[in-house]
Swiss-Prot record:
<comment type="function">
    <text>Removes the 2'-phosphate from RNA via an intermediate in which the phosphate is ADP-ribosylated by NAD followed by a presumed transesterification to release the RNA and generate ADP-ribose 1''-2''-cyclic phosphate (APPR&gt;P). May function as an ADP-ribosylase.</text>
</comment>
<dbReference type="Pfam" id="PF01885">
    <property type="entry name" value="PTS_2-RNA"/>
</dbReference>
<dbReference type="GO" id="GO:0000215">
    <property type="term" value="F:tRNA 2'-phosphotransferase activity"/>
</dbReference>
<dbReference type="GO" id="GO:0006388">
    <property type="term" value="P:tRNA splicing, via endonucleolytic cleavage and ligation"/>
</dbReference>
<keyword id="KW-0520">NAD</keyword>
<protein>
    <recommendedName>
        <fullName>Probable RNA 2'-phosphotransferase</fullName>
        <ecNumber>2.7.1.-</ecNumber>
    </recommendedName>
</protein>
<dbReference type="InterPro" id="IPR022928">
    <property type="entry name" value="RNA_2'-PTrans_KptA"/>
</dbReference>
<keyword id="KW-0808">Transferase</keyword>
<dbReference type="InterPro" id="IPR002745">
    <property type="entry name" value="Ptrans_KptA/Tpt1"/>
</dbReference>
<dbReference type="GO" id="GO:0003950">
    <property type="term" value="F:NAD+ poly-ADP-ribosyltransferase activity"/>
</dbReference>
<comment type="similarity">
    <text>Belongs to the KptA/TPT1 family.</text>
</comment>
<dbReference type="InterPro" id="IPR042081">
    <property type="entry name" value="RNA_2'-PTrans_C"/>
</dbReference>
<dbReference type="InterPro" id="IPR042080">
    <property type="entry name" value="RNA_2'-PTrans_N"/>
</dbReference>
Length: 189
């Protein structure tokens, strides 16, 4: 599978497993899962056919591990394999992730033009359900670079956790929080 096709299928999956499942007639369960066969049929009906082999390649090759496939599932009316996006949903789903103790520091990639709002309001999920935090500066830099020249913010996750804030970690290692109040951002200057 060539790189262009891989990216195209990955973007299609993100759009329909995170943001707009209804556009192709999918109904995600409460935890964001849908039967693989249902997804493949819906995509084909809406003019974007791809094979199970292509789907498996995208799931395995995605450097950000955006998707999870569970094989042989027999839960919630799904019999067979099911798939979901690991995080980043704008549709209502409960990823059913247990609370987790974060490392002392986590990182958030952003850009300068939103720093005034961040200093005042902290980090908010915006259209998503959670604020996404990276376990290392390198990942946060790549995230911030998608919107321009990146700035990396350090989050005092240990202090946040001790203050009662709940963290969860998705299947691909992205840390999730409901919000990050400004007092837990370690800002210079």
């Amino acid at each position: 599978m060539d790189e262009r096709r891989t990216v195209k299928v990955s973007k299609y999956l993100s759009k329909h497993l995170r943001h707009q499942p209804e556009r192709i007639g999918l109904t995600l369960d409460e935890n964001g899962w849908v039967a693989v066969e249902e997804l493949l049929r819906a995509a084909a009906r809406h003019g974007f056919a791809f094979s199970r082999a292509e789907l498996d390649h995208v799931v395995a090759a995605n450097d950000k591990r955006r998707f999870t496939v569970e094989n042989g599932c027999a839960a919630d009316g799904v019999h067979g394999d099911r798939i979901r996006a690991n995080q980043g949903h704008t549709v209502a789903v409960d990823l059913d992730l247990p609370p987790a103790e974060p490392p002392a520091h986590l990182y958030h990639g952003t850009v300068a033009r939103v720093m005034d709002a961040i200093r005042t309001e902290g980090l908010r999920p915006m259209a998503r359900h959670h604020v996404h935090l990276s376990p290392d500066r390198e990942t946060a830099t790549r995230v911030g670079a998608r919107r321009g020249r990146p700035l990396v913010l350090t989050v005092d996750a240990g202090a946040m956790h001790r203050a009662g804030h709940v963290f969860r970690v998705s299947a691909n290692g992205v840390w999730l929080a409901d919000a990050v109040p400004p007092r837990f951002l370690l800002l210079r200057g």
